[in-house]
């Protein structure tokens, strides 16, 4: 019997399998951790691949919406990325913190409560920046068109009020 352990929420799920049922295991390539997430993020914002630095895309005083994954994608560690990004927007781009709205992209999941939102964006950011849960059933969603497959696209009502929309995310 072999046990497979998966992080889930604040805990883990253990799945015991008879070794005869296991056809193989797929492991990702090891990627060393960044020495400093804020420094690595700053370098990426200053030197994005094929684009000018973020500070050249923005103007002081603009409104910015940050769209971030919900707690179901917390393995992306938004809590490590959002604080230095908000600081960069303030310090390098001249975007006041009261001009930043974080939209938590919940998909069809229920929105997080205050504790989850504070975990996601950190207490420091939660106390300084507006954080809202996206609700896919909200009556004020804004229609923006259709996809190539004729699927209607509706977005959070906060996004059209922003001069810039920055989406953070990762693929599982």
Regions found by a protein language model. Name each.
Residues 63, 99-101, 164:
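Residues at the starts of beta-strands that form the adenosine-phosphate
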Residues 66, 102-104, 167:
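Structural beta-sheet core signal
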Residues 74-95:
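Histidine-anchored nucleotide/phosphate-binding helix
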Residues 97-108:
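Short internal beta-strands
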Residues 49-65, 93-97:
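Glycine-rich phosphate/diphosphate-binding loops that line cofactor/substrate pockets in enzymes
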Residues 1-43:
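N-terminal amphipathic/basic leader segments beginning at the initiator methionine
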Residues 111-172:
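An acidic, phosphate/nucleotide-engaging active-site surface
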Residues 48-52, 84-88, 148-158:
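Short alpha-helical segments and helix-capping/turn motifs at coil-helix boundaries
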């Amino acid at each position: 019997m072999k046990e497979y352990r998966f992080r889930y929420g604040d805990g883990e799920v253990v799945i015991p399998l008879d070794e005869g049922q296991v056809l193989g295991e797929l492991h990702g390539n090891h990627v060393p951790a960044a020495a400093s997430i804020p420094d690595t993020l700053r370098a990426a914002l200053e030197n994005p691949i094929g684009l000018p630095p973020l500070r050249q895309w923005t103007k002081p005083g603009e409104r910015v919406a940050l769209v971030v994954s919900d707690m179901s994608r917390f393995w992306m560690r938004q809590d490590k990325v959002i604080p230095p990004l908000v600081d960069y927007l303030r310090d390098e781009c001249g975007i006041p913190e009261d001009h930043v709205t974080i939209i938590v992209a919940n998909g069809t999941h229920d929105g997080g409560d205050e504790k989850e939102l504070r975990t996601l964006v950190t207490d420091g950011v939660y106390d300084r920046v507006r954080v809202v849960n996206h609700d896919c059933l909200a009556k004020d969603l804004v229609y923006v068109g259709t996809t190539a497959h004729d699927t209607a696209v509706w977005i959070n009502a906060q996004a059209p009020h922003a001069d810039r929309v920055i989406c953070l995310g990762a693929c599982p």
